[in-house]
Amino acid sequence: ERLHWLCAAGGPATLPDPIALVAFPQGCQYRNRAIHALESAGRRWRIAYESPNLSGLQAAVEGGLGVALLEQRCQTPAMARCDALLPRPAPSELALCMSDTGSRAVHELARLIMDFCGDDKLRQAA
């Protein structure tokens, strides 16, 4: 699923400099992608709020503490997309590696993952 920049509903028409970022702790790929997108676009940023829990991030965004880069399904009614105000992050990539000697269950799981990732809805979201 494509990631979106989310802010509080009725949020600002422009964003502050530096960008107030709401993010998961260091090591999270969403955080890394948000920072990379901002830095690649020459935008300054600061961590305004950090939480290991999605509900904590959602509450911070809803409360207007900053913006977060999250999946669309994480958007609550109290949030709005602000993609037009911020740089688009690089698309997601997924690599699936398995051994030919894997069990039947491993091969079935791999097939399910490939079918899911090959879904037209996912291609359109990216």
Please tell me what each predicted stretch does.
Residues 4, 20, 44-47, 80:
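Conserved beta-strand segments of alpha/beta enzyme cores
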Residues 1-26, 93-101:
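Hydrophobic/proline-rich hinge and linker segments of small-molecule sensing/allosteric domains
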Residues 85-125:
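A late-sequence structural motif
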Residues 24, 44-53:
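Short beta-strand-to-loop elements that line the ligand-binding cleft
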